[in-house]
A protein has these predicted regions:
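Anionic-ligand-binding alpha/beta catalytic cores of soluble enzymes and soluble regulatory domains
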Residues: 97-146
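N-terminal beta-strand-loop-alpha-helix module at the start
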Residues: 1-59
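Short glycine/serine/threonine-rich phosphate/pyrophosphate-binding segments
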Residues: 14, 80-84, 107-112
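General beta-strand structural signal in soluble alpha/beta enzymes
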Residues: 7, 26-28, 47, 72-73, ...
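Histidine-anchored nucleotide/phosphate-binding helix
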Residues: 30-37, 86-87, 114-118
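Short phosphate-binding loop-to-helix
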Residues: 62, 69-92
Length: 215
């Protein structure tokens, strides 16, 4: 499955991002500065560049002159966020597995919008996650997700609609059996792995899953 790595303009403290030669790498707006700092050469630079420093803007303009197909300049006023536009480009390149970095922190509304982008990926038959130094965020929708026996940390589940039905959690500290998880009661917060092959099943609905790493 072809993978897309997107670097956004949120917070990024990591000293490296795992990128394979076959990955399609997109720098979304201010994510270009992170790519430059980490020595990553993106296949595509995309955005309205409202969060880009002048020095980086000049470099992007120079790249655009040399290789026009590697830079997409978006209008400042548009329906799609820069991140959603980057995801659409990744999908058009045939990618179905997305790793999205620097998509959290900063302005809260952008973090929430990026979470919604994960739902969009599910609707397109793809999968993705938001990754930072402390957590990985992904979507569970009408499916069962399995975790390895050596999984560690905390797993929190939140309904992304009015309710998620038939939620079953197995082999974790707190289990559920065919429960209804609503968006007004945080029953899925801070579950823990116990050294067994755990699973989460959602019969109908969408859950946001946050896997938080232990210190």
């Amino acid at each position: 499955m072809k993978r897309c790595v997107i670097v956004g303009a949120g917070e990024l403290k990591a000293s490296s991002i795992p990128v394979e030669k076959e990955d399609f790498v997109i720098a979304a707006d201010g994510g270009y500065a992170y790519c430059k700092r980490l020595g990553i050469v993106p296949d595509l630079i995309l955005g309205d560049f409202d969060s880009v420093k002048e020095e980086d803007a000049e470099q992007i303009a120079q790249i655009s002159r040399i290789c026009p197909d590697s830079v997409v300049i978006l209008p400042a006023e548009k329906d799609d966020t820069d991140m959603l536009a980057a995801i659409r480009m990744g999908l058009s390149e045939g990618c179905r597995d997305f790793r999205i970095y620097a998509a959290q922190g900063g302005r809260l509304e952008h973090t929430i919008a990026n979470l919604q982008c994960l739902i969009y990926l599910k609707e397109c038959g793809a999968a993705g996650c938001l990754v930072d130094e402390t957590s990985t965020v992904f979507i569970i929708r009408d499916e069962t997700v399995w975790f390895r026996e050596d999984a560690a940390g905390y797993l929190s589940l939140f309904s992304m609609g009015e309710k998620a039905e038939g939620v079953t959690i197995r082999n974790m500290k707190y289990e559920l059996d065919g429960a209804e998880v609503t968006n007004s009661y945080p029953i899925g917060i801070s579950n823990e792995f116990i050294g067994k092959r755990a699973s989460v099943t959602v019969k109908k609905g969408t859950l946001a899953a946050i896997l938080s790493h232990k210190d």
